[in-house]
C-alpha cells in the first residue's frame, strides 16, 4: 500500500512541477505606407506572445528572430526584404513584444495592394508563427 501511495505521490509531483510550454503567437499585424518625394515609406508591425524566456538571476530574457516578405501588387514575392533579431532582457516576465519594420520603396513600385508577411521564430524553442497584413500604395 505504501509503495502505491509513493508512486502516485511521485507522479503527481512530477505533473505539478512540469512547466507548460506556451505556443508562440503573432497578433495585431499592421502595415501602411505614405508617399515621399521619390517613392514611399512602408511601416509594418506585429506583436508576439507565448515565447520562451530564460530566467537569469532576477532577469528574464527572450530572443526572437524575424523575417518580412513583401508581395507586390503584381504578385511578385520579395522574400526576406527585412530581417532582424529582438533580444530583450528585463527584470520582470515579458508579456509580449512588438516587432517593427520600416522600409523605403522607390518609385519602381507600382500603386496597388501589397501583402506584408511577418515570420517570427522563438530562438529558444524553435517555434515559428506567421501573420500577414495588407496596405495600399497610392499616389
Residue ranges of each PLM-predicted region?
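Surface-exposed loops/turns
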Residues: 38, 110-111
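A short tyrosine-centered beta-strand micro-motif
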Residues: 112-119
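Short, surface-exposed loop/turn segments at beta-strand-coil junctions that are enriched for proline
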Residues: 104-110
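Sec-dependent N-terminal signal peptides
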Residues: 6-9
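Short, solvent-exposed loop/turn segments at the edges of extracellular beta-sandwich modules
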Residues: 122-125
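Positively charged n-region of N-terminal signal peptides that target proteins for export
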Residues: 1-4
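Contiguous segments within soluble domain cores/interaction surfaces
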Residues: 18-99, 119-120, 131-133, 137
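C-terminal motif of bacterial Sec signal peptides marking the signal peptidase cleavage site
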Residues: 13-16
